[in-house]
A protein has these predicted regions:
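Short polybasic linear motifs
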Residues: 91, 97-101, 129, 135, ...
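Conserved nucleotide-sensing/catalytic segment adjacent to the nucleotide-binding pocket
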Residues: 207-280
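A short glycine-rich beta-strand->turn/loop micro-motif centered on a GG-aromatic cluster
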Residues: 161-174, 214-219
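Short hydrophobic beta-strand that contains or immediately precedes a catalytic carboxylate
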Residues: 20-24, 37-40, 213-214, 260
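Flexible, polar/low-complexity N-terminal or interdomain linker segments that lie immediately upstream
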Residues: 1-35, 63-66, 70-77, 105, ...
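Catalytic cysteine-centered active loop of the rhodanese-like fold, especially the PTP/DSP P-loop
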Residues: 69-73, 78-95, 105-124, 135-165
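Glycine-rich phosphate-binding P-loop
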Residues: 146-149, 186-207
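Conserved NTP phosphate-binding and transfer environment spanning the P-loop NTPase/kinase superfamily
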Residues: 279-286, 290-391
Length: 391
């Protein structure tokens, strides 16, 4: 079998149902990668560094020889690692469900898809089978679509796998990801002061078959000083962008497709919403769910009062400069006295002030913002109020 080189669009098309192997080093993969890819490093971080040094200080040929020294003894291990990954990956994946851009009729058969996308010919889908069945198709990429992916693809092809490699490698994928943020989207923004349950509203809309993008979920952060509590560590900026681009690309958006997001500042924890996408959000209608202060305070106390005091104190200290020395100390003292509600009252006043400033700091704000008066942090009731306001 021959190794096939395919474009990033075709690579992503097939990746919906096929195994993606990223053969870059563990450090490169950890920094950022194509979502749902598996790391099968041809070289570890130390080996990659040695090869790079040889390339810079000696020659390309010497660097290749170093690479062969590392690659040769590991060929069997690489193949066996792929077999283990395939065995785990195959569970639960039983059919090929190709989503091809431009084919609006779901009844189009595979032969039609082959005609439009020749790349899918002879694809063997992951399907739990006896050990004697034909090995499935595998997608392989490295940084620039060069020697690393070529070497692994050659080895796996030799062993019997059907292999596709990505033209331009991960770098081509990154260019594709950044292109997603330059597109125009028909956004609708769910707004509300801190403690309004906006994320719950967003996912309630999703359950009713509306398209959403949960920026805070992708960022592993709820946006405020307390937003990291209860969340896993944030991804890198690059990985956040990859996740966001993938999410946007899965929404079959036509110009009329509505996508709901929460109202956010450009910064979510340590991450930044890509500037072009954020500008698009700032031009979108905002449905501001206006809930009384005390109701939101009760909700916030219930949500965050369960966390250890030490973590709460550390979170408050991170905004000390903006909160002010006196208010910071008061908020911490209330925490130490187990008076969570009064501590959070100070924080909520602070965030209400800053949210109001950000809410109206957009062009044409008076026409974009629709105020929706609500009495409780109640997802079911507030979704109905949103519907009454013609979202």
């Amino acid at each position: 079998m021959a190794v096939n080189k395919i474009t990033v669009e075709d690579f992503l098309l097939l990746s919906k149902n096929l195994l993606v192997l990223d053969v870059r080093s563990p450090g490169e993969f950890k920094h950022a990668h194509i979502p749902n890819a598996y790391n099968l490093p041809l070289f570890n971080d130390e080996e990659r560094a040695k090869i790079g040094t040889a390339y810079k200080q000696q020659s390309r040929e010497e660097a290749i020889k170093f690479g062969l020294d590392f690659f040769g003894p590991n060929m069997r291990t690489l193949v066996e690692n792929v077999e283990r990954i395939v065995a785990g990956y195959g569970e639960g994946v039983s059919s090929l469900r190709l989503r091809v851009t431009g084919l609006d009729n779901p009844k189009k058969n595979i032969s039609t898809i082959k005609k439009n996308k020749a790349v899918v010919k002879d694809v063997q889908v992951f399907n739990p089978q006896p050990a004697t069945s034909q090995p499935p198709t595998i997608l392989v990429h490295c940084w620039r679509g060069g020697m690393r992916s070529a070497a692994v693809a050659w080895l796996l092809d030799l062993y019997g796998f059907k292999v596709y490699t990505l033209i331009g490698g991960y770098k081509a994928y990154r260019n594709w990801a950044l292109e997603q943020f330059a597109k125009e989207y028909n956004f609708r923004i769910i707004g509300g002061y801190t403690g309004s349950g906006k994320t719950l509203l967003l996912h309630a809309l999703e359950k009713e078959n509306n398209a959403i993008v949960d920026l805070e979920g992708l960022a592993h952060h709820k946006g405020s000083a307390l937003g990291a509590l209860g969340n896993p560590p944030q991804p890198t900026q690059e990985m956040f962008e990859n996740l966001l681009a993938e999410k946007l690309s899965t929404i079959n958006h036509q110009p009329s497709t509505t996508i709901y997001l929460e109202d956010e500042s450009q910064r979510i924890g340590n991450l930044q919403i890509p500037i072009q996408l954020w500008y698009c959000m700032r031009k979108a209608p905002v449905y501001f769910v206006d809930i009384p202060f005390e109701e939101r305070l009760n909700y916030l106390t219930d949500e965050y009062g369960i966390h250890p005091k030490e973590k709460l104190v550390n979170a408050i200290m991170r905004i000390q400069k903006r909160l002010g020395g006196l208010e910071t100390q008061n908020a911490i003292n209330f925490l130490l006295e187990n008076n969570f509600k009064e501590s959070f009252r100070i924080l909520l006043h602070y965030y209400d002030k800053w949210y109001t400033k950000g809410l109206y700091n957009r062009e044409n704000a008076e026409n974009l913002i629709k105020n929706i008066a609500a009495t409780l942090v109640n997802t079911e009731q507030n979704i109905e109020l949103i519907k009454l306001n013609n979202i």
